[in-house]
Amino acid sequence: MNYRLAYSIGFHPWEDAACDQPFSEKISEMFGREENAREPPHGSALDVGTGSGIWGIELAKRGWQVTGIDIIEKALRRGRERAHDAGVDIRFVHGDVTTLEQTDIGGPFRLVLDTGTFHDFDERQRKAMGRGVSAVASSDATVLLLVWPKRRRPLIRGASRNEVAAAFPDWEITHVEPSHFRLPKPLDLLLRPDEHWYRLRRITHTPASPSCGGDARQRLGSAVGRRSDREGRGRGAVRGIGEP
């Protein structure tokens, strides 16, 4: 989708998601899961493709320190106005989400949110975004990714689970859940979004215990073998004393 054109003509139905109660309740539930009943502040959050900042503002209200990035300056201006009206402080950055590691956005971020950018990228862009997110996310970070399934439709490409996994090779998909969002009926029938939330967590690599590793077993086997050899040579020497 050409988002620059869409904003220039005032076409941004995704902003209506904030008025969709089932969707709003679901995203609020997901935010609550990451907050884990802790008192704010909750840490740094990055809103990727923030647009006019609807969900970044919601995160800021909940006690997150939010940075929003988008390539559409008109959307960012709307976001700054919305944040001012809501009385929250959000840092809005003009930049390309496929070059996050080259953009001065700060970090590391404990939460990365994308409510509809990734799934309209081609393979190269998806992998570039995945690398950038990995570069700016903290070691204990969570990614919440809103994705339309891959199918033939106008406007939005969509992405499959395998494509999500390929773009984030150092992350584990822990949850895939319906978003409960519905477009107005004509658009819903045309686009068939059937969107889902993907929750990803960094893969942690635990070193093998030395006492259980193959090298340790090999060293133990060698030591036992050497001891047996010594004992065998000793017994042979004793027997040889009485021989003619």
Task: Name each region found by the language model.
Residues 113:
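A conserved beta-strand element that flanks and buttresses the S-adenosyl-L-methionine
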Residues 116-120:
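Short catalytic micro-motifs in class I SAM-dependent methyltransferases
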Residues 110:
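Σ70-family region 2.3-2.4 aromatic/basic alpha-helix that recognizes the −10 promoter
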Residues 1-46, 52-107, 121-136, 141-244:
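Class I (Rossmann-like) S-adenosyl-L-methionine-dependent methyltransferase catalytic domain
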